[in-house]
Amino acid sequence: MGALFGDKRIIKNLSPLIVGGGHESGLRSGTQNVSGIVGFGAAAQLVKNCLSKYQFRMLGIKNHFFDEVRRQIPGVWDNGSYDRVNNTINLWFKGADANAVMTAMPNVCVSSGSACQSAVPAPSHVLIAMGIDRTAASESIRFSFGNTTTDEEVDQAILELVRAVGYVRAINGVALHLGSEIEVNNRAQSA
């Protein structure tokens, strides 16, 4: 069961997946699924009734996550704008390769790109299109929260993230301090 909403000029050019019968202007064949239609309507009403509460909760989780990460990890920037979905945040961890950080925290499910590009190892094309340079994009991680995400899971993710970013930066000789600029211990220069 689903719904199709769009510009009539585009919809009129669509072809049905299954032909036969003339339901829904020829786009759907067969007898209408009455119980599916009723269920879809009930689901839509449930979303309408709960959406504000869900969005408020997701915003609270995301803000708590970002506030704690920023408090505990130096050199963190939010790549997004204020006006965005409430359940997702993309953060740049200066001096910490995103893939290395993700590998160092196997119990936390995150991505270095958009959901549709999760298997692509290159920096996020979305971040590049936003004007973020390739280095910053390759050090950026996308965090998403859902309806079943608990406060305990968020706090555990923060702990693992703090450890993982610190570990990756230490391996790379990057030392950051809260409230200060980046200091890089370049082994090649000291040799």
Question: What residue ranges belong to the model's regions?
Answer:
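Active-site PLP attachment segment
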Residues: M1-S25, S29-A42
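Short loop segments at secondary-structure junctions
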Residues: D7-I11, K94-A96, T148
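A general structural signal for well-ordered alpha-helical segments in protein cores
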Residues: I11, V34-I37, A44, K62, ...
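Structural signature of PLP-dependent enzymes
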Residues: A44-D67, W77-V85
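A short linear hydrophobic-aromatic micro-motif
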Residues: P74-N79, V110-S114
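Conserved C-terminal alpha-helix-loop-beta "cap" of PLP-dependent enzymes
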Residues: T88-R142
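PLP-dependent enzyme catalytic core of the Aspartate aminotransferase-like
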Residues: S124-A191
